[in-house]
């Protein structure tokens, strides 16, 4: 596996008409199967620090990380109004943040998903089989519905935080994920809370977008709160929540006439054709389709394009045009010289 190589030069334009020519899209897809943006894991496994972390001090380091994550969640609940950690609002009849940190760390009820409760939005599960990871800090910024007038699309918050030197692990349309790890400091946690409070103040003051994020030239000349409302209205008008949910409902899963390996072999051998994205329904994908963020595969190579999957990717194309500063990178969807999207499918 390659790990963050600087570049690979592909100098084969003179072979463009030869049968052995490998198009850029095919090379890129194959290359991405063997690369990681993370450090080289086998090297990490041999580091002395790794051995140190898994010695007797390991549990203590993770306990400290756990404690910091609890303190951060309590701080967010007490000091912010637009941002809420994804947690049960009430535990044992009290608000989550009213529990003592030591009590929270010992009681799984503070991280439980109860099928009788509505706050988490999940259905179709029973009992106490699911718990939230206590060292993950999932911050919600709103909801797809119109229930909250102050819903803030998280791509905007994510971009702002990156301007402040804070990079979320992952983000969705209304969630931001952070990981509490050994080595995280209280200063680092406070920096995040302060940044979110600054965002809230700018939202309340309806500060001009160009003043709030001056490094992003494509933003409109309107207030932050007005922009958030327009952004949220766009997502609601396109029913983005249901489009996203349909990708992960078992009854909506696409058929897979080919295995991933078979699809990739067809892709390499040339049994492929590029078609406009809007004509993909009913065709077999030869590449994994993955929007980033959040970085989750929405259609795997070998699976068939369905109406739901196509609707979601057409929505993402429209989203990228309306809000280019927040447009996700989409692996598997390509664009020609005119900017029109196309995908690779199994040839007839």
Predicted regions and their residues:
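Active-site PLP attachment segment
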Residues: 1-30, 35-46
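Short loop/turn segments at secondary-structure transitions that flank enzyme active sites
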Residues: 18-20, 53, 184, 305
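A general alpha-helix detector
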Residues: 26, 49, 294-295
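Short glycine/serine- and small hydrophobic-enriched flexible loop segments
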Residues: 48-55
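Non-catalytic terminal extensions of PLP-dependent enzymes
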Residues: 59-348
């Amino acid at each position: 596996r390659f790990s963050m190589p600087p570049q690979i030069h592909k100098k084969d334009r003179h072979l463009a008409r030869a049968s052995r020519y490998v198009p850029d899209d095919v090379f890129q897809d194959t290359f991405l199967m063997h690369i990681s943006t993370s450090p080289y894991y086998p090297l990490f496994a041999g580091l002395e620090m790794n051995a140190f972390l898994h010695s007797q001090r390991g549990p203590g380091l993770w306990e400290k990380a756990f404690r910091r994550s609890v303190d951060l969640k309590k701080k967010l609940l007490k000091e912010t109004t637009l941002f809420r950690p994804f947690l049960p609002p009430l535990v044992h009849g009290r608000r989550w943040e009213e529990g003592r940190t030591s009590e929270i760390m010992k009681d799984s009820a503070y991280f439980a998903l109860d099928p009788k409760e509505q706050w988490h939005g999940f259905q179709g599960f029973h009992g106490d089989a699911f718990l939230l990871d206590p060292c993950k800090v999932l911050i919600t910024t709103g909801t797809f519905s119109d229930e909250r007038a102050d819903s803030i699309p998280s791509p905007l918050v994510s971009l702002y935080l990156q301007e402040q030197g804070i990079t979320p692990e992952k983000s969705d349309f209304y969630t931001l994920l952070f990981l509490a790890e050994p080595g995280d400091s209280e200063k680092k946690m406070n920096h995040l809370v302060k940044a979110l409070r600054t965002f809230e103040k700018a939202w309340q003051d309806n500060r001009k977008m160009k003043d709030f994020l001056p490094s992003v030239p494509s933003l409109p000349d309107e207030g932050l709160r007005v922009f958030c409302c327009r952004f949220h209205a766009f997502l609601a008008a396109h029913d983005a929540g249901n489009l996203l949910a349909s990708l992960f409902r078992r009854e909506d899963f696409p058929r897979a006439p080919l295995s991933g390996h078979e699809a990739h072999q067809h892709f390499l051998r040339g049994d492929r054709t590029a078609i406009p994205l809007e004509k993909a329904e009913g065709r077999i994908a030869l590449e994994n389709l993955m929007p980033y963020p959040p970085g989750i595969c929405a259609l795997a190579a070998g699976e068939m394009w369905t109406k739901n999957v196509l609707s979601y990717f057409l929505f993402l194309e429209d989203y990228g045009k309306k809000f280019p500063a927040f447009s996700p990178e989409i692996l598997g969807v390509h664009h020609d010289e005119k900017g029109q999207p196309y995908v690779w499918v199994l040839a007839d």
